[in-house]
Amino acid sequence: MMADEEEEVKPILQKLQELVDQLYSFRDCYFETHSVEDAGRKQQDVQKEMEKTLQQMEEVVGSVQGKAQVLMLTGKALNVTPDYSPKAEELLSKAVKLEPELVEAWNQLGEVYWKKGDVAAAHTCFSGALTHCRNKVSLQNLSMVLRQLRTDTEDEHSHHVMDSVRQAKLAVQMDVHDGRSWYILGNSYLSLYFSTGQNPKISQQALSAYAQAEKVDRKASSNPDLHLNRATLHKYEESYGEALEGFSRAAALDPAWPEPRQREQQLLEFLDRLTSLLESKGKVKTKKLQSMLGSLRPAHLGPCSDGHYQSASGQKVTLELKPLSTLQPGVNSGAVILGKVVFSLTTEEKVPFTFGLVDSDGPCYAVMVYNIVQSWGVLIGDSVAIPEPNLRLHRIQHKGKDYSFSSVRVETPLLLVVNGKPQGSSSQAVATVASRPQCE
């Protein structure tokens, strides 16, 4: 390009860049100028703003319309909505052909492919952009795409998830004040948590990353996906109050997205049913319950009764049989509980498998079992022993509803002894996390 021509083009590109930046600022900072009640209009308002911006850009472009930078900015403007735009794909494809080093065009084209559902093509764009220039946007996008790539084996998927965490960490390192990088790091930890057997340390890392996203970027608090993903983690961690709050907030921020409202409703229905069954001890008649409890035998403790139980620390310990009512919150080391199943309850997600346990002391506690295969379960009348039980006390208030109950969390069915028998490895499975396939 000649020097004079370059001088002529520069102010035009600058003006186009300003218009596109304003458009994205309108979308990303929508709730700074609108109330949450306007959330249902957001997509419509962004669409109108996009049309207005494209018209203004057309007036500015003039003779430079075929230049790669102009094609990229026009494609980026068209790409502001959550929907796939064939026109954006066409313009951005031309831009990268004309100027292969134009990293922002590769990033935008990758997002277009992502919206189109072509995850492999999106992956190629983001990886390609990084070969030209290491940048946080490509790293962020690569992190989220890696978690969605089709894989043939569980190992391959785990490898992609680990790689996703690495890319997100690199993005954070490039700019610790970028809320999107922290949010995507939180999502990659969320996937890692579900693909590697629910390590509490990883869930803490996910929650910390989400908190950091909100701390460094005020826009993060208006991101419905952040609230839904964090609520999913809270639900799995049995922090039900925080989970309900998160689902409710996500629903308010994106009323057209049905999932948060459904998840909130499902959790409320689960808590309604659970507390009702706990209060009525599964509606088992008093006489029948006495007969069930009268049939409990020391033999039902199985391997928990012979001093050969191996604790989490790997040491052989002798367990002491304790009534449910004497348990303390947290892990009760050196103790074992034994009771009868009076009801069972499954949710839409099938995890956890929840049942009510009663012992001769009287109270009914919920037992939540994680990492189960779908076919696993216990029946009413089964005797269940739980070594070193982990007790949770729940006090939940949400939208005028109050719930209060005690539960025992069991990370795997392998820890349970049912009717005197330990559970085989075929009873254990790994949980997975589902997310909507869109740019984060």
Swiss-Prot record:
Protein name: Tetratricopeptide repeat protein 5
Reported effect, residue 254 to A: No change in interaction with 28S rRNA of ribosome-coding tubulin
PTM per Swiss-Prot/TrEMBL: Phosphorylation by ATM kinase induces nuclear accumulation while interfering with nuclear export, and phosphorylation by CHEK2 kinase enhances nuclear stability.
Residues with Phosphoserine modification: 203, 221
Binding partners and assembly: Interacts with JMY and p300/EP300; the interaction occurs in the nucleus and augments the association between JMY and p300/EP300 in response to DNA damage. Forms a complex with HSF1 and p300/EP300; these interactions augment chromatin-bound HSF1 and p300/EP300 histone acetyltransferase activity, resulting in enhanced heat-shock-responsive transcription. Interacts with PRMT5; the interaction is DNA damage-dependent and promotes PRMT5 interaction with p53/TP53 and subsequent methylation.
TPR repeat positions: 7-61, 68-98, 103-130, 136-174, 179-216, 224-253
Predominant cellular place of this UniProt entry's protein: nucleus
Induction text: Induced upon heat-shock stress (at protein level).
Localisation per UniProt entry: Nucleus; Cytoplasm; Cytoplasmic vesicle; Mitochondrion matrix
Top-level taxon of origin: Eukaryota
Keyword Repeat attributed: yes
